[in-house]
């Protein structure tokens, strides 16, 4: 039984929100190439009467509902990209795109935004602020920082406050998690390229073994996290991919490895980056052609006033609110948008999208990934309350 109550007016959009999510779930697209998704959302926002602003060369866009000139503007972010993995869900609306799935639930983020946007447009006579919905490309791939590109393109221009949510199917529908500080880690994706010298496997002294050097560097990176950072400041290092060598009886002359590194404070982030640079320098002095490219996101840090506004907007109809949750070790490029708003007035919160009774209790990026459609109106109600209460 539900322990929350959606407004009667918003409840009328329940079927609309489900239909939107189910369609978007069928067409997940890779980061930066969300063409069908973007076109669908743009057409929908235009039909509601929003002024749509596109970004040449990018799939992201924002849409404005303008009430008056000299009043504040509140913005909401919805990310659009899917993940490169098969959709293993058993539903009539499973992905029709091979090896693509919405296993991070961005389909729900867009459905929530579109539902809230429709409601606000139909009830704009009750608003006392301007509204912007930002449909962001490329949140998943740290090599293509979609939020940063959109900020550079002007998506935050004129914005006074900004909010975003992320679904979490390990939490029950009707619950929210947030805090008034760090919500996500400083995170970076790294790509390590090592060039050595090939030689016959019987004469290893004549070559420079790129695989052995990769193992040494990866081990050193693990050591940095374990021994060069404070035990009171968590950090996580991971290597998820290694490719190298061509035949079994030769010294390999090239290796590429890729992974991520994350931390929970800016000082630790700086320590990690400085040690990474010294490791690469040491490798080149050993004769290897070694480079490391690192791209990542700063942490999302919730503004205290924006945090309070989320609490107020959720607590008026929800009972299960954790206002002191621990930050996630994952990273979010929503930080670029928050940092671009005056006084950094913005907040990210987690929205329960699971349901134990329905057997929905899974983690982001797991496969299959299910979420409960009942979360859609809960998220939309919070967004609506943020601009109407």
State each model region's role.
Residues 25-27, 102, 106-109, 166, ...:
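Histidine-centered active-site/metal-ligand motif
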Residues 2, 13-16, 20, 33-44, ...:
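General structural feature for long, well-ordered alpha-helical segments within catalytic domains
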Residues 2-102, 107, 111-129:
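Acidic/His- and Gly-rich active-site-bordering loop/insert found
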Residues 75-77, 86, 190, 347-353:
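Non-cysteine beta-strand/loop elements that form the S-adenosyl-L-methionine
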Residues 24, 76, 106, 133, ...:
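Divalent metal-coordination and catalytic microenvironments
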Residues 215-389:
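Metal-dependent amide/peptide-bond hydrolase catalytic core
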């Amino acid at each position: 039984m539900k322990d929350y109550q959606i407004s009667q007016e918003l409840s009328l959009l329940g079927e609309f929100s489900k239909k939107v999510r189910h369609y978007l779930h069928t067409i997940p697209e890779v980061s930066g190439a969300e063409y069908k998704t973007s076109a669908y959302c743009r057409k929908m926002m235009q039909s509601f009467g929003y002024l749509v602003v596109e970004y040449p060369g990018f799939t992201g866009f924002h849409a404005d509902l303008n009430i008056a000139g000299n009043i504040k503007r509140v913005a909401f972010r919805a990310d659009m990209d899917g993940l490169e993995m098969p959709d293993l869900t058993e539903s009539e609306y499973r992905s029709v795109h091979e090896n693509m799935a919405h296993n991070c639930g961005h389909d729900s983020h867009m459905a929530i935004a579109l539902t809230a946007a429709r409601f606000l447009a139909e009830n704009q006579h009750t608003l006392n602020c301007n509204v912007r919905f930002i449909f962001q490309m490329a949140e998943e791939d740290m090599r293509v920082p979609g939020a940063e590109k959109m900020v550079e393109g002007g998506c935050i221009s004129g914005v006074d406050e900004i909010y975003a949510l992320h679904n979490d199917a390990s939490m029950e529908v009707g619950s929210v998690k947030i805090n008034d500080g760090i919500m996500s880690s400083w995170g970076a994706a790294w790509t390590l390229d090592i060039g050595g010298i090939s030689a016959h496997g019987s004469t290893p002294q004549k070559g420079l073994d790129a695989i052995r050097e990769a193992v040494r560097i990866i081990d050193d990176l693990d050591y940095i996290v374990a021994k060069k950072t404070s035990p009171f400041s968590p950090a996580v290092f991971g290597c998820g991919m290694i490719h190298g060598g061509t035949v079994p009886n030769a010294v390999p002359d090239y290796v590429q490895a890729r992974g991520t590194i994350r931390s929970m404070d800016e000082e630790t982030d700086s320590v990690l980056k400085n040690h990474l640079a010294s490791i690469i320098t040491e490798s080149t002095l050993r004769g290897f052609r070694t480079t490391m490219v690192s791209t990542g996101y700063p942490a999302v840090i919730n503004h205290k006033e924006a945090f309070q506004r989320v609490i107020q907007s959720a607590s008026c109809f929800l009972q299960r609110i954790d206002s002191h949750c621990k930050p996630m070790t994952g990273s979010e490029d929503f930080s670029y948008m928050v940092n671009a708003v005056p006084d950094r007035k913005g907040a990210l919160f987690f929205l329960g999208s699971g349901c134990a009774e329905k057997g929905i209790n899974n983690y982001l990026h797991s496969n299959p990934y299910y979420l409960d459609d009942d979360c859609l109106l809960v998220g939309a109600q919070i967004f609506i309350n943020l601009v109407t209460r």
